[in-house]
């Protein structure tokens, strides 16, 4: 009982300080940063599985553009606690936020304007595995622990049989440290905008968000501070063309070799209505909307915030945002 209580208290103590967001994307080892990510307004979780925020988080900012991806290639999603901080010195998602990592895709007509209401199919999951030496679920192997081991990175195979077109890719980490009561599970997700090229014709079965999860699902309403004999990852099964990772497995590929500033990078074309928009009055001016990036290390975009907001360093020197 004492061990359980201390573990629970430790998890609760880390609750407020260890929120996180998926931010950057690598495509076959090429660093696209956050250019095609709809960055959430904050690093706080979504807890209501019946809200539309369960699709792509609450009030995400428009992405700069769409990342080009070939069907059958590997993308690597990257999570960190603070906006713009891609350092490996801190856990990607700390505070004993243990749980699975899942990735979904949705075929859309235009990734820049899609609202996430179309169907989703799961292409990846890294869930749970028993630690024979552990005494509770906290001691077991989890997808979020793998994120922490791999500097926030998780490799995801894009199914080779997908047809060409625009897609949303939804990366999600589920923290279960307070999931012992209904509404306690914490969902951290970001949607990335992709343009996929391929010759496939697959049409995977889909689920809807909201709708795919229930607050009482066994993988959502669960006490991980007690010993676990099994765990069911929420949502549908992974599509046959996707991939899985066994919790506790070693970092591979880009998870272990990709490092910010030491490899190839790429820039995407700016989508209409994204981060920087023309300011009235001409003169080549631009305006950054509230909650969007306006500065930071390596940033070369617009720095003029829309009326009513100012450019503030939220994670110096990496990231500044209009607030």
From Swiss-Prot:
Signal sequence residues: 1-18
Organism placement in taxonomy: Eukaryota, Fungi, Dikarya, Ascomycota, Pezizomycotina
Function statement: Lytic polysaccharide monooxygenase (LPMO) that depolymerizes crystalline and amorphous polysaccharides via the oxidation of scissile alpha- or beta-(1-4)-glycosidic bonds, yielding C1 oxidation products. Catalysis by LPMOs requires the reduction of the active-site copper from Cu(II) to Cu(I) by a reducing agent and H(2)O(2) or O(2) as a cosubstrate. Is active on regenerated amorphous cellulose (RAC).
Localization of this protein: Secreted
Sample GO molecular function, one term: cellulose binding
EC numbers for this chain: 1.14.99.56
Reaction(s) catalysed by this chain's protein: [(1->4)-beta-D-glucosyl]n+m + reduced acceptor + O2 = 4-dehydro-beta-D-glucosyl-[(1->4)-beta-D-glucosyl]n-1 + [(1->4)-beta-D-glucosyl]m + acceptor + H2O
Gene coding for it: LPMO9B
Assigned protein family: Belongs to the polysaccharide monooxygenase AA9 family.
UniProt KW keywords: Carbohydrate metabolism, Cellulose degradation, Copper, Disulfide bond, Metal-binding, Monooxygenase, Oxidoreductase, Polysaccharide degradation, Secreted, Signal
Pfam families named among the record's database cross-references: AA9, CBM_1
SUPFAM superfamilies (alphabetical): Cellulose-binding domain (SSF57180)
Residues covered by the CBM1 domain: 286-323
Record keyword Disulfide bond present: yes
Cellular component terms per the entry's GO annotation: extracellular region
Residues the record lists as binding Cu(2+): 19, 97, 188
GO biological process: cellulose catabolic process
Domain comment (free text): Has a modular structure: an endo-beta-1,4-glucanase catalytic module at the N-terminus, a linker rich in serines and threonines, and a C-terminal carbohydrate-binding module (CBM). The genes for catalytic modules and CBMs seem to have evolved separately and have been linked by gene fusion.
Organism: Thermothelomyces thermophilus (strain ATCC 42464 / BCRC 31852 / DSM 1799) (Sporotrichum thermophile)
Cofactor: how and how many bound: Binds 1 copper ion per subunit.
Cofactor: Cu(2+)
Superkingdom of origin: Eukaryota
Biotechnological utility: Lignocellulose is the most abundant polymeric composite on Earth and is a recalcitrant but promising renewable substrate for industrial biotechnology applications. Together with cellobiose dehydrogenases (CDHs) an enzymatic system capable of oxidative cellulose cleavage is formed, which increases the efficiency of cellulases and put LPMOs at focus of biofuel research. Concerted enzymatic process involving the initial conversion of monophenols into diphenols by the polyphenol oxidase PPO7 leads to up to 75-fold improvement in LPMO9B-driven cellulose degradation.
Residue numbers binding O2: 177, 186
Thermal characteristics: Optimum temperature is 40 degrees Celsius in the presence of ascorbic acid, while most C1-oxidized gluco-oligosaccharides are released between 50 and 60 degrees Celsius in the presence of 3-methylcatechol.
Annotated protein name in UniProt: AA9 family lytic polysaccharide monooxygenase B
Regulation (activators, inhibitors): Is able to utilize various natural phenolic compounds as reducing agents. Most of these reducing agents are present in plants, either free or as lignin building blocks, such as sinapic acid, or as flavonoids such as catechin and dopamine. Phenolic compounds with 1,2-benzenediol and 1,2,3-benzenetriol moieties yield the highest release of oxidized and non-oxidized glucooligosaccharides from cellulose compared to monophenols or sulfur-containing compounds.
């Amino acid at each position: 009982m004492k061990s359980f209580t201390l573990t629970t208290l430790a998890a609760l103590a880390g609750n407020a300080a260890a929120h996180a967001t998926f931010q950057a994307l690598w495509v076959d080892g090429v660093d696209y940063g956050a250019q095609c990510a709809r960055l959430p307004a904050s690093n706080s979780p979504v807890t209501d599985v019946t809200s539309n925020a369960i699709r792509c988080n609450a009030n995400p900012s428009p992405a700069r553009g769409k990342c080009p991806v070939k069907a059958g290639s590997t993308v690597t999603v990257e999570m960190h606690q603070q906006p713009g901080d891609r350092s490996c010195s801190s856990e990607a998602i700390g505070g004993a936020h243990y749980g699975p990592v899942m990735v979904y895709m949705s075929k859309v007509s235009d990734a820049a304007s899609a609202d996430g209401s179309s169907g989703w199919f799961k292409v990846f999951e890294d869930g749970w595995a028993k630690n024979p030496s552990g005494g509770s679920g906290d001691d077991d192997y989890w997808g979020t622990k793998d994120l922490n081991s791999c500097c926030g990175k998780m490799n995801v195979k894009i199914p080779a049989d997908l047809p060409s077109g625009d897609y949303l890719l939804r990366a999600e980490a589920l923290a279960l440290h307070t999931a012992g009561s209904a509404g306690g599970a914490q969902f951290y997700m970001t949607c990335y905008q992709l343009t996929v090229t391929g010759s496939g014709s697959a049409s995977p079965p889909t689920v809807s968000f909201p709708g795919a999860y229930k607050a009482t699902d066994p993988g959502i309403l669960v006490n991980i501070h007690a010993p676990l004999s099994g765990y069911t990852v929420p949502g549908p099964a992974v599509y046959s063309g996707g991939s899985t990772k066994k919790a506790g497995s070693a970092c591979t590929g880009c998870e272990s070799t990709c490092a910010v500033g030491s490899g190839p990078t790429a820039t995407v074309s700016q989508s209409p209505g994204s981060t920087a928009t023309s300011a009235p009055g001409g003169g080549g001016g631009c305006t950054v909307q509230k909650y969007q990036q306006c500065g930071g290390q390596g940033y070369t975009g617009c720095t003029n915030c829309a009326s009513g907001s100012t450019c503030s360093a939220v994670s110096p020197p990496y990231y500044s945002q209009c607030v």
